[in-house]
């Protein structure tokens, strides 16, 4: 490595580390048989958007395993560092208006988070822990969920082409490497899904499409890195 190359390589390494940390935890979608995961950042964007109609303003949001010791093994290898399939816990700090009873706001927020987690994403949430951090005089304005920014990728092989053609797939992505990463008898596919499709349903369809398109029918894992709207 030359002196000139050193700073550029260091900057590239630092950027890659920041990008990986920005994804948050890799959360299981569905159960152990589903072979699918979603980044915490992508899931949090959907949950924040859903919470905006509850009368609460979510300040911090964290999603983790409810009890990793009880989590079963997945049927396929997951992405490096991914949480095992199992029930999840959502922790949220929020502010609320004094013009509405706090228990009612908390109940509405909890219901919104649980509904979005199940119906829009496919997360199995066991509990929601809420903590109020501030009381406001006025109702907080609706908050649009921030869409995760990810690097998109074009299909480069049969697996990528099959995945990209599944309804609900916006694009392939390369947050952890290439859009399709191959191991021995196993493929991992990264992608962004459309907000009008349930993320787990899209991931299941991608797994089936890729396994059927590739010779020898490898096992397939899917990582959803963004949930976004079509342009």
Language-model features: locations:
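Terminal low-complexity, intrinsically disordered regions
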Residues: 1-131, 136-143, 148-231
């Amino acid at each position: 490595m030359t002196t000139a190359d050193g700073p550029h390589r260091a900057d590239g390494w630092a950027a890659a580390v920041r990008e990986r940390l920005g994804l948050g935890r890799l959360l299981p979608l569905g159960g152990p048989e589903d072979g699918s995961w979603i980044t915490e950042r992508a899931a949090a964007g959907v949950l924040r958007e859903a919470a905006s109609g509850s009368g609460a303003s979510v300040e911090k949001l964290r999603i983790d395993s409810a009890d990793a010791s009880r989590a079963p093994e997945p049927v396929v290898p997951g992405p490096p560092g991914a949480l095992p399939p199992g029930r999840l816990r959502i922790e949220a700090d929020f502010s609320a208006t004094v013009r509405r009873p706090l228990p009612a706001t908390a109940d509405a927020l909890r219901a919104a988070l649980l509904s979005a987690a199940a119906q829009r994403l496919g997360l199995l949430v066991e509990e929601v822990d809420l903590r109020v951090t501030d009381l406001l005089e006025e109702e907080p304005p609706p908050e649009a969920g921030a869409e995760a920014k990810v690097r998109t990728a074009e299909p480069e092989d049969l697996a990528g082409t099959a995945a990209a053609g599944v309804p609900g797939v916006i694009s392939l992505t390369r947050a952890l490497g290439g859009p399709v990463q191959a191991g021995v008898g196993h493929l991992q596919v990264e992608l962004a899904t459309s907000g009008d499709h349930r993320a787990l349903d899209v991931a299941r369809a991608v797994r089936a499409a890729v396994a059927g398109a590739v010779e020898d029918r490898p096992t397939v894992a899917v990582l959803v890195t963004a949930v976004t709207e079509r342009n």
